[in-house]
């Protein structure tokens, strides 16, 4: 693409101005994880553990049945994207457990 020059005609005509950068609107932060929410969720996970379907999905992930685990979780949580997120979360938990076991030995 050609270099843009300030000219009187064409797409770049007119005065040279600096772009007014506005800060993101408050409504854009919906769904973002806060420190407090993360703390509460971690506390609940520590107290309650995993749901039965999550434990079964973790067993499937342990034996490298990733696709089967995804289908199983999708059936339980409803949507493909939520299932992928849940599978990722559970595989991260398994990796952390493996890491902790290796560190302990």
From Swiss-Prot:
Gene Ontology MF terms in the entry: structural constituent of ribosome
Name the Gene3D superfamilies for this protein: 60S ribosomal protein L36 (1.10.10.1760)
Show the disulfide pairing.
Answer: none
Q: Name one GO cellular component term.
A: ribosome
GO BP terms? translation
Looking at the keywords, is Transmembrane helix present? no
* Lineage top rank: taxon: Eukaryota
Q: Which family does it belong to?
A: Belongs to the eukaryotic ribosomal protein eL36 family.
**Protein name per the record:** Large ribosomal subunit protein eL36
Q: Which organism is it from?
A: Hydrophis hardwickii
């Amino acid at each position: 693409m050609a270099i843009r020059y300030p000219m009187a005609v064409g797409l770049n005509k007119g005065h040279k101005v600096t772009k007014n950068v506005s800060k993101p609107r408050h409504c854009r932060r919906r769904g973002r994880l806060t420190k407090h929410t993360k703390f509460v969720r971690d506390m609940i996970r520590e107290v309650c553990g995993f749901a039965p379907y999550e434990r079964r999905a973790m067993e499937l992930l342990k034996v490298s049945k990733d696709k089967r685990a995804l289908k199983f979780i999708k059936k339980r949580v409803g949507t493909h994207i939520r299932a992928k997120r849940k599978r990722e979360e559970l595989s991260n938990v398994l990796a952390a457990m493996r890491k902790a076991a290796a560190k302990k030995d």
